[in-house]
């Protein structure tokens, strides 16, 4: 099964701040989509991310403070259903490194290509949010094609 993989490094932040941006409703709404409902700070919780007429619901599978967040997609686009999204944090020199993986796609369809690019854009929004205090969550994100 194909996966989407990205690596970004962030300066002037801490693993704790990155973890909070990945595991709180407020943090997630500052870099992914401003229309975020629910809580993501405990295992088993669900959170819904709205993107206009589309939505994605995830369940938090694992939380390891300042180190790892793992989600499972429970509702949303058919291609996303049952996939898992992992964020692994580590510190290297004066960077917090984020290793991102959106795994278990059934096939490398056109939508996966689109989502790979959009994940890169949203991860850059996360980096911007943590380094400057202002991200570019949906609907302020960069548009890349006719699907958004």
Predicted regions and their residues:
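Hydrophobic pocket/interface hotspot
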Residues: 18-19, 28, 47, 60, ...
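Glycine-rich portal/gate segments that line the openings of hydrophobic small-molecule binding cavities
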Residues: 29-75
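Glycine-centered tight beta-turn/hairpin loop motif at sheet-sheet or coil-to-beta transitions
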Residues: 1, 53, 78-80
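Hydrophobic/aromatic beta-strand elements that line small-molecule binding cavities or substrate pockets
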Residues: 7-9, 58-62, 83-90
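Short, highly charged C-terminal tails/helix-capping segments
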Residues: 128-148
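A short, structured loop/turn motif at beta-sheet edges
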Residues: 14-16, 61-66, 88-97
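Hydrophobic ligand-binding cavity/cleft-lining segments
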Residues: 1-38
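Beta-strand/loop substructures that line and gate deep hydrophobic ligand-binding cavities in soluble
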Residues: 76-121, 126-128, 137-139
